[in-house]
A protein has these predicted regions:
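A generic structural signal for short, solvent-exposed coil/turn residues
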Residues: 36, 80-83, 101, 116-118
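Extracellular/periplasmic head regions of type IV pilus-like filament subunits
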Residues: 63-98, 109-113
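Alpha-helical assembly-interface signal, strongest on the long, hydrophobic N-terminal helix that forms
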Residues: 2-69
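Low-complexity, S/T/G/P-rich flexible repeat/linker segments used as non-globular hinges
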Residues: 2, 101, 106-134
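Secondary-structure transition/hinge residues
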Residues: 56-59, 76-80, 134
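Short alpha-helical scaffold segments that flank and stabilize functional sites
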Residues: 51-54, 71, 79, 129
Length: 134
């Protein structure tokens, strides 16, 4: 009977469950958070890149901002941003020359929004060069 009590077979499983599982929980939480942040940054980069492309392809500065805003909103909806996140989208256009669509000009779009789950501000920038023959 004493030999059966001293037998340690199966104790490694108990030690693993008691010690290792609680240590894995923070790792899983971190990886989930990291995946969420990475996904949000990918979405905002696409919005910035396509928004500035739409601006550069337009005929005037006014229509460029309108079309760019429409593109950004459409992409945000299609890539899964919530309506509260879409409402927090902020865009800032910087041009190296005025009007922005003049030849050899550079347009830089900085866009940001507030993630509804983490309440972090996610930001990205993209720039487009205007052809010298425009």
């Amino acid at each position: 009977m004493k030999n059966k009590l001293r037998d340690e077979s199966g104790s490694a499983i108990v030690e693993f469950v008691v010690l290792a599982i609680p240590l894995f929980i923070p790792v899983f939480i971190y990886l989930n958070s990291f995946a969420s942040v990475s996904g949000n940054e990918a979405v905002i980069r696409v919005m910035a890149r396509e928004g500035v492309r739409a601006y550069a392809a337009s005929d005037s500065d006014y229509s460029g901002r309108v079309v760019s805003g429409q593109v950004i909103e459409l992409i945000a909806q299609n890539l899964g941003l919530s309506s509260s996140e879409i409402e927090t989208i902020d865009t800032n256009y910087q041009c190296s020359r005025l009007p922005c669509l003049s030849a050899n000009s550079r347009i830089r779009l900085t866009i940001s929004y507030i993630d509804s789950r983490s309440h972090r501000t996610i930001e990205a920038s993209a720039q487009e060069n205007i052809s010298p023959w425009k």
